[in-house]
Amino acid sequence: MLLFWLSLAVGAIGSAAITLSCGLVGAWYDFYIPVLLFFGFAFACVALAFLFAFILSLFSDKKKPVDRQNRLYAFVFHTINAYLIFMSRAKVKVIGLDKLDKAQNYLIICNHLSRFDPMIIENRVKNKPLAFASKPGNFRIPIVGGVIHKCGYVSINRENDREALKTILHVCKMVENTGMSYGIFPEGTRNTEPQKGLLPFRAGALKIAQRCGIPIAVFVTRNTNSIHKRFPFRSTKVELELLEVIDAETVKTTSTVDLAKRAKDEMESALYGKVIDRQTE
């Protein structure tokens, strides 16, 4: 976010300096010259951030596990996220963050409507460094894959229990050593028909909280799936709400199936005003 505002400041100063030094102000249409220069400078600074991310991705070996979040990669990634949220014209209302203990790390779970969901959560939940469990395909995206790997993102192999456990233990090691929080979407994929209710939850995803001995923070997002439909001509009001925190002791003594049902019921009550009868996987 700092880089974004810095880019605007540089754009403003640069456009004003060029306008004054060249004596460009004269006719009414000359007003647009500093405006164009302003956005030109801002765009150039953001383009440099993307170029920097590309260069950083060249030094990311995705086959080599990371033991902590790289601050430089995280800074660049979060700055670009903040810029994309701003440019999408998403107006984010955050509710209930006061329920989080700033000294505590969490497993953050949320419904999944849009690609903007993890971006908004990362941008607004700032008490601890945060990474997500992501699908394998995201690590194959040019630039993005290398950067998120260095940010501590992991891919959980749901088809291989042994590999999944290995990844969960690795996550717990990072949580213990660095105090990170982790986010996961228990629906497993984006819900393209949210009007029908939440998708079945993958209860195994909550094993991260049990193995790591951390609380579960239950969030919901609202209307993030409308952002791409309204962009660029209309802004979109979206919400990120923290519904409840399931304490570590309850997480430890409750089965993942029961935890998943509790979280899913809580989310559906908040989103639809009722619990929708669907299975938990």
List the predicted regions and their residue ranges.
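Short acidic-hydrophobic, aromatic-tinged amphipathic segments that line or gate anion-handling sites
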Residues: 94-95, 154-157, 248
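A generic local structural motif
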Residues: 79-80, 92-96, 118-119, 168-171, ...
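Catalytic core of membrane glycerolipid acyltransferases/transacylases, capturing the structured
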Residues: 57-78, 86-87, 102-161
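Short, well-ordered coil/turn elements that cap or connect secondary structure elements
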Residues: 87-89, 127, 148-150, 177, ...
